């Protein structure tokens, strides 16, 4: 079996772990910032095409302990890189080190690169490797002196679904947007609303989840070009994903924004995601938000003081939005992502639950309101 590592934003590990288990992979282990699992070659494709909240899919080739450069070099050189990287393959190296003796990332990059060059040169009988072929990105991590050597099977991050042709300022990554939808326990039955929709990411991810449409169907992945991987696994994984999609259901998914240009972009993105028949976008003022019906949920990412608005303007916006939300039935659930430390005071309500998340490098809280949480 092959071993995989799926890095993710801090706070999303359990969601990614649940996704991996649902796909049927073995030995799933959740760690800080990543999920480890085991599977077959076909799971390279299945993970890449189906994961909503993971950052990327890494193929783990080796794990060992190293506290000096010689051990790092020998451990790297012992890996059968030639089983994966052909003689013309390009293999850049990147990585990170946390709480480890080998703390200099550039030095570790150099050592890993040198060891792989030596191994492949010996395997192919070459003094100089051309590196003119397809890319085989090597990624290493060193955490508490434990080294993990991987090949990046995704290429571009999994947040790049292929539907964001253009964006508005300060977009929310698709992986985090999908996580917000999942944390709201949206099941496709109740109305789903994002009153600060921007380029539509949260509502589009809700539509993909409601329809059980795999997020990676409209893009390509690095491992599709690997010579050592059977091309058929990608067709089979795509067929499996499309067979699992729901086609005969209707949903009430709505996004609103006060900026007409943002709404235009959101509609275009929904078309690219092939969910324009599932989600509706309108020009609307979030401070006047209202909705009929006894049940529903609001999941939204309003402007932070750190980005689009000055802090006082953001606070006034939170107050006005809070007054609008107060008019909803108590049976509604409301989820608001914000980095503002005084959000609850401004919003006018103490959250029933909070969850710490990161929007990129920005530390945030997901404020959750509702009796049915």
Model-derived regions, located:
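Non-catalytic nucleic-acid substrate-recognition regions in nucleic-acid-modifying enzymes
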Residues: 1-134
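Short beta-strand/turn micro-motifs composed of small residues
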Residues: 8, 257, 338
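A short, flexible beta-alpha/helix-coil linker loop
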Residues: 98-101, 157, 303-307
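C-terminal edge-of-domain segments
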Residues: 138-154, 367
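SAM-dependent Rossmann-like transferase core, predominantly class I methyltransferases
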Residues: 149-185
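Conserved S-adenosyl-L-methionine
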Residues: 172-291, 306-307, 311-315
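C-terminal catalytic and target-recognition region of SAM-dependent MTase-like enzymes
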Residues: 285-288, 292-373
């Amino acid at each position: 079996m092959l071993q995989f590592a799926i890095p993710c934003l801090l706070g999303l590990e359990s969601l990614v772990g649940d996704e991996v288990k649902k796909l049927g992979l073995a030995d799933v282990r959740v760690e800080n910032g990543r999920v480890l699992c085991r599977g077959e070659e076909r799971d390279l494709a299945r993970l890449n095409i189906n994961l909503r909240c993971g950052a990327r899919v890494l193929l783990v080739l080796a794990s060992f302990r190293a506290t000096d450069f010689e051990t790092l070099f020998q451990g790297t050189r012992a890996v059968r890189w030639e089983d994966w990287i052909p003689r013309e393959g390009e293999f850049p190296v990147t990585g990170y080190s946390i709480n480890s003796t080998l703390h200099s990332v550039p030095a570790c990059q150099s050592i890993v690169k040198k060891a792989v060059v030596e191994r492949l040169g010996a395997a192919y009988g070459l003094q100089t490797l051309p590196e003119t072929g397809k890319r085989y990105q090597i990624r290493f991590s060193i955490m508490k002196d434990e080294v993990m050597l991987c090949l990046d099977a995704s290429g571009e991050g999994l947040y790049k679904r292929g539907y964001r042709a253009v964006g508005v300022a300060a977009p929310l990554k698709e992986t985090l947007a999908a996580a917000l939808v999942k944390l709201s326990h949206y099941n496709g039955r109740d109305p789903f609303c994002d009153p600060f929709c921007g380029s539509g990411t949260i509502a589009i991810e809700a539509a993909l989840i409601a329809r059980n449409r795999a997020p990676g169907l409209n893009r390509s992945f690095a491992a599709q070009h690997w010579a050592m991987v059977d091309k058929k696994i990608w067709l089979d994984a795509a067929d499996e994903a499309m067979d699992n999609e729901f086609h005969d259901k209707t949903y009430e998914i709505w996004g609103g924004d006060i900026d007409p240009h943002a709404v235009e972009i959101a509609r275009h993105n929904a078309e690219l995601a092939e969910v324009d028949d599932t989600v509706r976008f309108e020009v609307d003022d979030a401070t006047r938000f209202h909705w009929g019906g006894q049940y529903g949920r609001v999941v939204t990412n309003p402007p932070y003081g750190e980005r689009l608005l000055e802090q006082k303007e953001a606070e006034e916006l939170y107050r006005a939005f809070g007054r609008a939300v107060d008019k909803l039935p108590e049976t509604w659930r409301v989820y608001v992502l914000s980095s503002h430390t005084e959000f609850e005071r401004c919003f006018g309500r103490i959250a029933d639950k909070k969850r710490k998340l990161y929007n990129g490098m920005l530390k945030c809280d997901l404020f959750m309101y509702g009796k049915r949480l």
